[in-house]
């Protein structure tokens, strides 16, 4: 019989889990089957082999290694003895202590790096899962989600070597993208603020114009009242006025109006006459209408309100000596003028309320907003450059990682289709893998099967023996990609019916360059072409 280049001869176990004292298994044949019911130690023996190949077998309830020891022992020892192509033997031993491990090759202590390096020279790669297969993990490889299957193949293909740098560059890219998005939103926010500012300014001008128009109508009504009162005054008021000495007018007499205003004992200085108020209101209405049109045409210009009117030169007339009848008429005129003064103050108050309610400061203008937009645009452009550089670096690494992953997937696809058809003994049967993302295939992989006269079906919908055959076909395809001298399969008959086991057995016997160790509960499975070892409870 042809044997692999390296062949496992014996397994020696001391105080490992359920095995007390020293326990030896072997020698092993090309295909060796362990038969026994649940609880006889089949799976523990498989775990012992995996322990030698470097698996930690962690227990989430016990952070130390006590879960590896039998009862109250303080250490466990597992040793594998191999026969080399030249006929010599090599022994690998791993010793588990309470918080650490020690390693031996032959009878010499070595470091963990030297130990794993020597195993690697014999093509034992536990990270690739091509040595040991467990009934709770790897044997159910196709039952994983698409993301879990992608992560599993990422480990097997060793494209996971790029993952730390990939994740770092991806984080930088995501941060750069979020920065670009943040500044873009900031620009949009300032642009919206600009539109609101312009709209609010125009609306303020509209309200101001409307309020002035209403106030003007009130003033006109007041003027009519004053004119009516003045019409009743006798002509001798005019004669009395002529008897009072005239004051010298301003040097700019021709350019200024002379207004006669009363001088009473209360000394109301600087009273606004009806003519001046009318003129002032008309100027304000005209000014605001022009400002409204100018703001529409030039929304980025500052808005300024002028409160100054034309200079008025007046002469004072003393009405204190007039009779009471005339004094009453004069007091009515003064009271009306006072009302106008209060109305003007009300206009100023309304204008200030508009400014306060809309939170518009006097120095707020379009130029300030445009400056903020310019600053935000500059930072947005800088963020775009950083994002472009981060994307370029990430893209280079993504291409390298995808290339290594695809170099693994291409031969795996071919092997999977062939092995599945061989095990199923149906040339029309087809099993294949499909990445969910072609640019980043390592993120998610889904497995499909196409039987005769059927559509493509996801393997996650399979049950029983059909699913087990797909699992084994995929495991054998992974092993064929980079074969190791030994493959261990625990509970190979799980969910297999007798006819399916008869399909698996011939395939194992044809793999002359690989040694197989399998466990089963059924003594009628895998017995025709293999060496059997029965384990008792």
Curated annotation (Swiss-Prot):
InterPro entries, sorted: P-loop_NTPase, RecF/RecN/SMC_N
Binding of ATP, residues: 36-43
Main location: nucleus
Family to which the UniProt record says this protein belongs: Belongs to the SMC family.
Tissue spec. comment: Expressed in the germline.
Keyword Nucleotide-binding applies: yes
Coiled-coil intervals, chain numbering: none
Quaternary structure note: Interacts with dpy-27, mix-1, dpy-28, dpy-26, capg-1 and smc-4.
Organismal lineage: Eukaryota, Metazoa, Ecdysozoa, Nematoda, Chromadorea
Molecular function as annotated in GO: ATP binding; DNA binding
Signal peptide: none
The name this protein goes by in its record: Structural maintenance of chromosomes-like protein 1
């Amino acid at each position: 019989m042809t044997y692999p280049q390296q062949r496992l001869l014996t397994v020696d176990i001391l105080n490992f889990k359920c095995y007390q004292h020293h326990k030896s298994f072997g020698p092993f044949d090309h295909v060796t089957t362990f038969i026994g019911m649940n609880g006889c130690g089949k799976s523990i023996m498989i775990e012992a082999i995996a322990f030698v190949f470097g698996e930690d077998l962690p227990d989430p309830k016990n952070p130390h290694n006590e879960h590896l020891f039998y009862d109250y022992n303080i250490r466990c020892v597992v040793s594998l003895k191999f026969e080399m192509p030249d006929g010599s033997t090599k022994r690998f031993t791993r010793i588990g202590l309470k918080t650490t491990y020690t390693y031996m090759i032959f009878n010499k202590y070595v470091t963990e790096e030297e130990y794993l390096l020597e195993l690697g020279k014999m093509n034992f790669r536990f990270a690739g899962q091509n040595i040991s297969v467990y009934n709770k993990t790897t044997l159910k490889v196709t039952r994983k989600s698409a993301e879990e299957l992608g992560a599993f193949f990422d480990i097997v293909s060793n494209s996971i070597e790029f993952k730390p740098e990939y994740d770092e560059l991806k984080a930088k890219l995501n941060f750069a993208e979020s920065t670009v998005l943040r500044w873009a939103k900031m620009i949009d926010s300032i642009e919206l603020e600009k539109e609101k500012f312009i709209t609010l300014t125009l609306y303020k001008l509209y309200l101001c114009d409307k309020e002035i128009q209403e106030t003007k109508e009130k003033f006109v009504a007041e003027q009519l009242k004053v004119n009516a009162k003045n019409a009743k005054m006798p002509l001798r008021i005019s004669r009395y006025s002529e008897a009072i000495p005239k004051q010298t007018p301003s040097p700019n007499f021709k350019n200024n109006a002379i207004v006669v205003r009363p001088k009473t004992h209360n000394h109301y200085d600087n009273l606004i006459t009806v003519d001046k108020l009318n003129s002032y209101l008309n100027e304000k209405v005209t000014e605001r209408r022009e400002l409204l049109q100018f703001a529409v045409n030039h929304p980025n210009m500052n808005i300024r309100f002028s409160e100054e009117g034309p200079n008025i030169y007046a002469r004072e007339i003393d009405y204190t000596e007039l009779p009471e009848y005339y004094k009453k008429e004069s007091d009515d005129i003064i009271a009306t003028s006072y009302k106008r003064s209060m109305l003007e103050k009300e206009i100023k108050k309304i204008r200030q309320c508009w400014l306060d309610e809309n939170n518009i400061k006097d120095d707020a203008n379009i130029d300030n907003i445009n400056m903020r937009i310019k600053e935000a645009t500059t930072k947005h452009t800088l963020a775009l450059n950083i994002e472009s550089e981060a994307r370029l670096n990430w893209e280079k690494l993504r291409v390298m990682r995808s290339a290594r992953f695809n170099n693994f997937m291409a031969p795996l696809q071919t092997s999977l289709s062939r092995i599945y058809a061989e095990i199923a003994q149906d040339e029309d049967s087809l099993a294949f893998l499909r990445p969910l993302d072609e640019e980043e295939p390592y993120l998610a992989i889904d497995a499909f099967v196409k039987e005769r006269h059927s559509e493509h079906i996801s393997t996650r919908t399979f049950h029983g023996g059909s699913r087990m055959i797909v699992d084994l076909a995929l495991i054998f395809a992974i092993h064929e990609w980079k074969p190791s001298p030994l493959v261990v399969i625990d509970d190979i008959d799980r969910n297999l019916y007798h006819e399916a086991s008869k399909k698996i057995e011939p395939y194992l016997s044809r793999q002359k360059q690989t040694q197989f160790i399998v466990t089963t509960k059924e003594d009628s499975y895998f017995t025709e072409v293999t060496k059997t070892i029965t384990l008792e409870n």
